[in-house]
Swiss-Prot record:
Keyword set, alphabetical order: Chloroplast, Plastid, Ribonucleoprotein, Ribosomal protein
Annotated GO biological process: mitochondrial translation
SUPFAM superfamilies according to UniProt: Ribosomal protein L16p/L10e
Subcellular location: Plastid, Chloroplast
Protein name as annotated: Large ribosomal subunit protein uL16c
Family named by the database record: Belongs to the universal ribosomal protein uL16 family.
GO molecular function, one term: rRNA binding
Subunit structure: Part of the 50S ribosomal subunit.
Alphabetized PANTHER family for the sequence: 50S/60S RIBOSOMAL PROTEIN L16 (PTHR12220), LARGE RIBOSOMAL SUBUNIT PROTEIN UL16M (PTHR12220:SF13)
Major place of residence: plastid
GO terms under cellular component: chloroplast; mitochondrial large ribosomal subunit
UniProt cross-references to InterPro entries, sorted A to Z: Ribosomal_uL16, Ribosomal_uL16_bact-type, Ribosomal_uL16_CS, Ribosomal_uL16_dom, Ribosomal_uL16_sf
Length: 135
């Protein structure tokens, strides 16, 4: 699972998911990509599940780039705990994704194989996505 090696602060505010992604919205490394169409938090488990699904599907040959990184800690309170007494402890990490953001890129495979692999990865994501081709 992806997570930062160390952070400056243990806990973060939740923040808001306003607007569209101005950074990371173009294909940089590969030929095919999966692009987010909705705003959400994507957990490190979901990122890893999508990556594994794509890797298994393209087998040998082809290269995959993961373009998002979970750098935001999400805190949870213990179950059956009364309100108050501070914020909960960090439980997992999420990547903040806005519409237009590229999630995965791929190259070195035929388009039909890439389309199939990326659609399987898209089914692991909690949002609507689209398959795009560079050029």
């Amino acid at each position: 699972m992806l997570s930062p090696k160390r952070t400056r602060f243990r806990k973060q505010h939740r923040g808001r998911l306003k607007g569209i992604s101005y950074r990371g919205n173009r294909i940089c490394f590969g030929r095919y990509a999966l692009q987010a169409l909705e705003p959400t938090w994507i957990t490190s488990r979901q990122i890893e599940a999508g990556r594994r699904a794509m890797t298994r599907n393209i087998r040998r040959g082809g290269k995959i780039w993961v373009r998002i990184f979970p750098d935001k800690p999400v805190t949870l309170r213990p179950t059956e705990t009364r309100m108050g007494s501070g914020k909960g402890s960090p439980e997992y990490w999420v990547a903040v994704v806005k519409p237009g953001r590229i999630l995965y890129e791929m190259s070195g495979v035929a388009e039909n194989i890439a389309r199939r692999a990326i659609s399987i990865a898209a089914s692991k994501m909690p949002i609507k996505t689209q398959f795009i081709i560079s050029g």
